[in-house]
Curated annotation (Swiss-Prot):
GO cellular component: cytoplasm
One GO molecular-function entry: translation elongation factor activity
Protein name in UniProt: Elongation factor P-like protein
Organism of provenance: Yersinia enterocolitica serotype O:8 / biotype 1B (strain NCTC 13174 / 8081)
Disulfide bonds: none
Length: 190
């Protein structure tokens, strides 16, 4: 059990008999005195895959569920299933393409470090990605000479098909760091 203001992204809650995974949280602070802060949470139903949105006051109690997190690496594709291998005991975890379609946009060829699978009582629930990923731009308009760092943005397409806005001075072939949750450009990769 936890109060709504203690819930974080990636946690699991039991709400109305449904097992929900917290995908995103928006905090809305009212300007009126005495009004309580609202937490607008977006969930993914673990069993059906449907997206659910709910609002809670900060002091509302939610039934949290303890999940097991295991570090994994991408292994191979088998038909429409993506297989991830446990880093410690090499247990394979299979996901259907539809289950992780959103996450696949951020996984470069060859995988990435920091991925985890979430399980509960041996049941595979979700794939969790790290906060950032470094990816190479495959397509964008040519860079403009003399474009300042605070100039306009332009769309850029990554090797996975992901499209994000980047500054005008970035050119194709450059590696950039992307904030996964916010889907935004953070800077050039080291």
């Amino acid at each position: 059990m936890a109060r709504a203001n203690e819930i974080k992204r990636g946690m699991a809650v039991n709400l109305n008999g449904k097992l929900l995974l917290v995908k995103d949280i928006d905090v809305q602070s009212p300007s009126a005195r005495g009004a309580s802060t609202l937490y607008k949470m977006r969930f993914s139903d673990v069993r059906t895959g449907l997206k659910v949105e709910e609002r809670f006051k900060g002091d509302e109690i939610l039934d949290t569920i303890t999940l097991t997190r295991r570090s994994v690496n991408f292994s191979y594709i088998d038909g429409d299933e993506y297989v991830f291998m446990d880093d410690e005991d090499f247990t394979p975890y299979n996901f259907k393409k539809e289950q992780i379609e959103e996450e696949l946009l951020f996984i470069p060829e060859g995988g990435m470090p920091g991925m985890q699978v979430l399980t509960m009582d041996g049941q595979l629930l979700a794939l969790e990605l790290p906060q950032t990923v470094d990816m190479e731009i495959v397509e964008t308009a040519p860079s403009i000479k003399g474009a300042s760092a605070s100039a306009r943005n332009k769309p850029a397409v990554m090797s996975t098909g992901l499209s994000i806005q980047v500054p005008e001075y970035i050119s194709p072939g450059e590696k950039i760091r992307i904030h996964i949750v916010e889907r935004r450009y953070m800077g050039r990769a080291d």
